[in-house]
Amino acid sequence: MSSVATIKRNIIPPHLEVKGGRPLSGILKVSGAKNSSLALMAAALLTKEKLLIQNVPELTDIEVMSEILRNLGAKLTKTNNSIEINSESIHNVELPYELVHSLRASFFCVGPLLTRLGEAKIPLPGGCNIGARPVDEHINGLKALGAEVEVINDVVKAKVSTKDKRLLGANITLKYPSVGATETILMASCLASGKTTISNPAREPEIQDLAKMLNSMGAKVFGAGTKRITILGVESLSGTSHCVIPDRIEAGTFLIAAAITRSPLIIGPVIPNHLSAVISKLKECGCSISQHGNHHLKIIPIEISGVDITTSPFPGFPTDLQAPFMSLMATAKGSSKIKERVFENRMQHVLELNKMGACIYLENNTAYIKGVKELVGSNVEGGDLRSSAAIILACLSAKGNSIFTGLEHLDRGYEKLEEKLTNAGSIISRKFDQITSHSSFSNKIISEDNIDTQKNAA
């Protein structure tokens, strides 16, 4: 009997390979705001006329929202970074779970569906696993506007039972300035009968961008970006053309990329007052930041020292940049403290950063960081969108090579990230499933013998 040698093959899942320790240079281009684009796309359901949204980033979240709108009966035409939406023939009031479970912004459709069709059935939404983000404030706001809302088997069922099928204006006070709840109430009240006020609303730039587009459609929204928003309901809204604001979170990520690689960079386009808290902390930790032309910022890192931050709603330090800033603090001189006050499960990057040589101690939602001279390349994994960005920044600054898995998270919020970073001088490339026998990849390698087992467990 002849013996047959068995070769065990290993597979690396789709990943980024990063050669760290290289300075960046030039310009990092900022795309349109993802979070703004998603709300604007949902708002297109409010009118029977065509609506053109420009400067929309190419992201998987945008693709999911596009599919949701098509499922409702809307017609979409995409050209480069523009999307034309025609919602004249929407007819479906129920969203499928397979689309909604991965995108929290899908819940934005509830208000427009109520105003257009008088009914909506939407499964409780998903998104990044960063802690509880209940839709209670959304539901309470819709109820205040006269909608009948109930949650049955994790499906939100809402309808308008008034004789004319219109919601009714109301005075609403949010317990917490939730961005999503503010946007839901804002869209639902535009076509309501009478006057609506939202006290303690979210003041984020994305709220202001939504209000600006709604007003260009014929809505009457006043006070977006302040502590009280007033909406005077109108009979109908028209189509319009609107350009999405620059993504302040991507811009902040790029500013931190410059700081962590100790590289002078130009970042833009940006709206500086959307980044005031971030710019302030970067200056405090040792960066020079100045206006460069009308729409760009120039950042020059000098000597990075530890500073403390606490996340809070706008205009405070954004929770979406907590993780990237922690990567920077991991390489800063001295100690720092980062407190997360918006979400209770947003420290998934700490373990991966420590794997790269960072010295971070986590106590509840506060991270205590002792800066190290340098991070070391490693095999690392992102657990959500912003932790993935933080880990990529760490890989850029680290000594040696890194393999990053978790592209499904990164692709949700950063358009063509590796292409932009490559243009700025980094060595970073996207790789797909590969066969390898290198032991250095061991903690990210999946044995073919165990693939089915792991799929079943997931």
Swiss-Prot record:
A GO MF term: UDP-N-acetylglucosamine 1-carboxyvinyltransferase activity
GO biological process: cell division; cell wall organization; peptidoglycan biosynthetic process; regulation of cell shape; UDP-N-acetylgalactosamine biosynthetic process
GO CC field: cytoplasm
Compartments it resides in: Cytoplasm
Post-translational modification 2-(S-cysteinyl)pyruvic acid O-phosphothioketal, affected residues: C128
Binding site for UDP-N-acetyl-alpha-D-glucosamine: R104, D320, V342
Catalytic activity: phosphoenolpyruvate + UDP-N-acetyl-alpha-D-glucosamine = UDP-N-acetyl-3-O-(1-carboxyvinyl)-alpha-D-glucosamine + phosphate
SUPFAM superfamilies named among the record's database cross-references: EPT/RTPC-like
Presence of keyword Nucleotide-binding: no
Binding positions for phosphoenolpyruvate per the UniProt entry: K34, N35
Record HAMAP family: MurA
NCBIfam families: murA, PRK09369.1
Job of this protein: Cell wall formation. Adds enolpyruvyl to UDP-N-acetylglucosamine.
Protein name, as recorded: UDP-N-acetylglucosamine 1-carboxyvinyltransferase
Source organism of this protein record: Prochlorococcus marinus (strain NATL1A)
Gene (name only): murA
